[in-house]
Amino acid sequence: MTTLALVLAKLPEAYAPFAPIVDVLPVIPVFFILLAFVWQAAVSFR
């Protein structure tokens, strides 16, 4: 049980280098919505 607690405690340190990537992730769906508008503008909203 204590081993599991130690592993869980180490996880945030292990993922620390990825923090900047995680900060950007919520913005990705917005890019897809913008892409949809650009695509429709390119095909003249058929």
UniProtKB/Swiss-Prot annotation:
Residues 1-9 form a propeptide. One of its GO terms (cellular component) is chloroplast thylakoid membrane. Pfam families: PsbK. Disruption phenotype: Not able to grow photoautotrophically, grows normally heterotrophically. Accumulates less than 10% PSII, although the subunits are synthesized normally. It is found in: Plastid, Chloroplast thylakoid membrane. The chain crosses the membrane at residues 18-38. InterPro entries: PSII_PsbK, PSII_PsbK_sf. It is a single-pass membrane protein. GO terms for biological process: photosynthesis. Keywords: Chloroplast, Membrane, Photosynthesis, Photosystem II, Plastid, Reaction center, Thylakoid, Transmembrane, Transmembrane helix. PSII is composed of 1 copy each of membrane proteins PsbA, PsbB, PsbC, PsbD, PsbE, PsbF, PsbH, PsbI, PsbJ, PsbK, PsbL, PsbM, PsbT, PsbX, PsbY, PsbZ, Psb30/Ycf12, at least 3 peripheral proteins of the oxygen-evolving complex and a large number of cofactors. It forms dimeric complexes. This protein is tightly associated with CP43 (psbC), one of the core proteins. NCBIfam families: PRK02553.1. PANTHER family: PHOTOSYSTEM II REACTION CENTER PROTEIN K (PTHR35325:SF1), PTHR35325. One of the components of the core complex of photosystem II (PSII). PSII is a light-driven water:plastoquinone oxidoreductase that uses light energy to abstract electrons from H(2)O, generating O(2) and a proton gradient subsequently used for ATP formation. It consists of a core antenna complex that captures photons, and an electron transfer chain that converts photonic excitation into a charge separation. Required for assembly and/or stability of PSII. Belongs to the PsbK family. This is Photosystem II reaction center protein K.
